[in-house]
Regions:
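N-terminal signal peptide c-region/cleavage motif recognized by signal peptidases
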Residues: 15-19
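Bacterial N-terminal signal peptides that target proteins for export
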Residues: 1-7
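N-terminal, motif-rich segments that launch catalysis or mediate targeting to/interaction with membranes
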Residues: 21-134, 141-265
Length: 265
């Protein structure tokens, strides 16, 4: 019933305009592209059976593109699937998922669908696209929110003079400052990944990813004595490298997770 609801909602959304993207379209697609280059041949074959010619970069933004769908699933149920909440000083293991679910509980749920031999190809495709998106989301530090400011959405800032919020800066403003198309950006970041980095980052444990995001999250807020600060070159210089590290890690972790998902198939 759940998968049928998602399928019907997706079909209804074909005529619905896209919502705002998390990590930005560029960020999600960079992560998908990096993963595509690092998955095993077996995993690639399994993905092609499900998605056909659609690659991971193209699939990565689907869950955001559907968020403007008026269907109840997208407006009520699926919203929490894009983030986790971990108050400062606590761990995800301590707080767990709320009753309405979150990114990690949804990740487990969709993983079960992809692994289910009785699930239809359509249901598996929807679940796989959610997996690709969620892994990217939880590598964005403000998608591991502290529970106080809606993941930085309530933290008003200016970005080179433009009114915005801290969440938007991390979703897109930082990485879009490179002015690169996602394929160019991904190729550049792939060249920067040392073999030792790929080995060190190769973990399919979502709680590790969340712990990293919460640790970074607590270092990226403007100083407390600033009201509506104007973030510019200094903030960009200090944090763009961290954002790009999370893109690289997100791509490697997505590959690791998908290899694990399809290992038993």
């Amino acid at each position: 019933m759940f998968c049928r609801t998602v399928t019907m909602a997706a079909a209804a959304a074909l005529a619905t305009p896209s919502a705002a993207f998390a990590w930005g379209q560029t960020g999600h697609r960079v992560i998908g592209e990096i993963a595509q280059e690092n998955i095993s041949g077996k995993t690639l074959a399994e993905i092609e059976l499900i998605l056909g010619e659609e690659d991971l970069a193209e699939a990565s933004t689907w869950a955001d593109e559907e968020r403007s769908n008026p269907d109840n699933f997208w407006q009520r149920e699926a919203g929490p699937y894009h983030y986790v909440t971990v108050p400062e000083g606590q761990t995800y293991a301590e707080v767990g998922a709320p009753e309405e679910g979150d990114a990690l509980s949804a990740l487990a749920r969709f993983t079960q669908i992809v692994r289910n031999p009785n699930a239809s190809r359509q249901d598996k495709a929807l679940a796989l696209k959610f997996i690709v998106h969620i892994v990217g989301d939880v590598h964005q530090p403000l998608h591991a929110g502290n529970g106080d400011d809606r993941g930085g959405n309530d933290v008003k800032v200016r970005w080179f003079g433009d009114e915005t919020n801290l969440h938007a800066v991390w979703d897109s403003r930082l990485i879009d400052s490179r002015s690169l198309f996602y394929t160019e950006y991904a190729r550049w970041l792939i060249r920067e990944i040392e073999p030792s980095d790929a080995i060190a980052w190769w973990t399919a444990d979502p709680q590790v990813w969340v712990a990293e995001s919460t640790q970074i999250r607590d270092t990226i807020y403007p100083t407390a004595d600033q009201s509506n600060p104007n973030l510019g070159y200094a903030y960009q210089y200090e944090h763009l490298g961290t954002a790009e590290m999370r893109l690289k890690q997100g791509g490697i972790r997505l590959a690791a997770y998908l290899d694990q998902v399809f290992a038993s198939n």
